[in-house]
Each structure stands twice: as C-alpha cells, then as structure tokens.
Amino acid sequence: FTADVESELSFGIGLEELKRNPDDILDLAEALAVSKNIRLIICIDEFQNVANFGDSLAFQKKLRAHWQRHSHVAYCLFGSKRHMLMDVFANVSMPFYKFGDLMFLQKIETEEWIPFIRQKFQMANKVIERDEVQLLVELVDNHPYYVQQLAQQVWLRTEKLVVPSIVKEAYNGLIDQLSLLFLNSMETFSNAQLGFLKALIAGEKQLSSKQTLQAYRIGTSGNVVRIKQALMEREVIDLQGNKITFQDPLFEAWLKRDWFK
C-alpha cells in the first residue's frame, strides 16, 4: 500500500447506527481498511491520558478487546509521560499489559539538528552557522519541543546572521515566558522536596549523606527515596541508572537562574 495524498477515504456508517452500536466506533478503522483492501496505521498521541478517563479500567479493557482482533490495522500509541505509560503497558494488572512492543525514543542528536535548522533559516534568507545551532540545541539539552521553540525565537530576532548573543537572549526570553508557570508549580512542592531539588541544582552527589540531609533540610535518608518516587511520578525528574536528571531542561535552568540563585 502506497500513500497517495490525493486519495480520499470514506465510510458508510451513519450517526444513528453508531448510537445504536457504539462499539462499532472501535472497529471503524478495521472496517474501513477491510472495505478498501488496505492496511492502516493509527497513531494516537499522549495515550497515557486514557488513565484519566471515567471508569478507565473498563474502557481500556474494551479497547484491547476490540483492537487485538484487528488484522488490517496497527496501532502506534505515543506518550510523553514515561511513568504513566509504563503503568499502562508494563503493569501486569492492566489491560494493555504486553499489548505490543515498547520503544523508548532517544533524544535527537545534535548532528541531526544542525542541517535541519540551518536549512530552515536559509529558506528565509537568514544564516545560522554550525556553532550557533550547536549552542541552541545544547542550551535546551536536545529537548525537541524546546529546540523548535528556541529556534523560532532566534529566527524572529535575526535579520541576517545569527550570533551567539542572539541565541542567549532568545534562551533567556524563553525562560522568562515560562517563569510564571514554573513559579506556580513551586507551590505544589513540600519543603523537603524543595530541599531535594536545591541539592540537585547544587550538584550534590551523595543525596542521602548526613551532611546533605541537614544542609538542605531533606529529612531522613528514607525520605530521599520517597521524594525521588514522588518527583518521578510527577515527571519532574527521571532516573537513569544512578543518574538523576530533570525532565524539563528549562525548569532546571529557571531553578538555577531565579529560584535558587
């Protein structure tokens, strides 16, 4: 099956029929694929939000019951909240346990960003050299959403040639735009969690040491474990091996620049 942007797909299930048989909606893609003798890939973003639906468990069971019978449709389920996705797909008690292959997408490498961003600037008769693209990408830790946001801010500030000062000005401007959002989030952290975040920003390695616990008023070493878990569930931090990283590089930068200055 070769994609054809000029093709139109249509189906003949009426609204009244769907009201009588709502389950038909879940089989709609399969019915359409069979009728057109094609194969479809259905992509659903932020799928972890299914956990927030009313009677979520029953809904997930129904989804799986229908989808697992589809032979002409493949489902690609995306999400940005790793912890919530893992609960949906890797929890043995959940309906979507082992529903398919799990893939963790890595950050886009800087070398991949360089030609892409330079080309976009060239299309507008603007020039951004390799070093400036590298600076732009590394400032936001290769975070794809922020790379594109920062690139746009740099583009708007540039008449002809991008210089490092423009990138840094745009970077600080982006942090300023998000500062109110970050500020409001600080009210949701406990004092011990704030102390833990401050220790991370300060580069402390021995987070459970007596000196660190006292210096940052974190509490007990057992509290460190609970704080880590709570912050991971909130998608504030990520734990890869023994390394703790911030999920949001601009939140980390704001903490360093403004909150814990």
Q: What residues fall within each predicted segment?
A:
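A short, conserved structural fragment
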Residues: 232-242
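Short, amphipathic alpha-helical interaction segments positioned at domain boundaries
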Residues: 250-261
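Winged-helix-like regulatory helical subdomains adjacent to P-loop NTPase cores
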Residues: 138, 142, 148-219
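Helix-loop-helix "sensor" segment of P-loop NTPases
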Residues: 87-138, 160-161
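Conserved Walker B catalytic segment
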Residues: 8-81, 90
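Conserved nucleotide-binding/hydrolysis micro-motifs of P-loop NTPases
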Residues: 47-49, 80-84, 108-111, 154, ...
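Short amphipathic alpha-helical interaction segments
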Residues: 216-234
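Accessory beta->alpha helical hairpin/"wing" motif in late/C-terminal subdomains of nucleic-acid enzymes
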Residues: 241-252
